[in-house]
Amino acid sequence: MIDKNVVTRIVDEWLEGKDYFLVDVTVSPDDKIVVEIDHAEGVWIDDCVELSRYIESKLDREEEDYELEVGSAGIGQPFKVLQQYLIHIGKEVEILTKEGKKLEGVLKDANEENFTVTIEKKVKPEGAKRPKLVEEDITFAYDEIKYTKYLISFK
C-alpha cells in the first residue's frame, strides 16, 4: 500500500512557492489516492493536471499500481483546514454544532484555536411592538462543531 505520508510530502514539494494549500490526502487500501487542494481564488484544472503529473513522476507504477485523483476541496463541502476558514473570512457560512444546532452567519475571524461568526437574530426590545434584527458575534472552538461550510447564495 502506498504511504499517505509519502504522497503528502510529494504534494508539499509541489506546493512550495505557490498560493495553493493542501486540504486533504487519502489513500485507500486498494491504492486509490485522492488529493484535495484549495486556493483563495479557486482551483484551476491546469494546476490539478500539473500536480497530478508531478505526483505520477515521483511514484513508481511498476512498483505499486495506483489510481490518482487530484481536485479542489469542492464548494459547499465542510472545511477541513484552517486556511479554508481564513480564505472565507467575510463570507457567509453554515455551521452545524455537535448539539445539532444549525446557524448561518458571516465568518469574522479564525485562528488555530477557534473561529468567530457574526449572526443576525431577532430581539424584541422592552416596550417595542416588533423585534429588531441585531448582530451577535459567536466564537466556536473547532471541537464544538460537526462542520462549517461556505454557504452558496443565489441572491
From Swiss-Prot:
It is found in: Cytoplasm. InterPro entries: Ribosome_maturation_RimP (IPR003728), RimP_C (IPR028998), RimP_N (IPR028989), RimP_N_sf (IPR035956). It comes from the Bacteria. Keywords: Cytoplasm, Ribosome biogenesis. GO terms for cellular component: cytosol. The keyword Signal does not apply. HAMAP family: RimP. This is Ribosome maturation factor RimP. It comes from Phocaeicola vulgatus (strain ATCC 8482 / DSM 1447 / JCM 5826 / CCUG 4940 / NBRC 14291 / NCTC 11154). The gene is rimP.
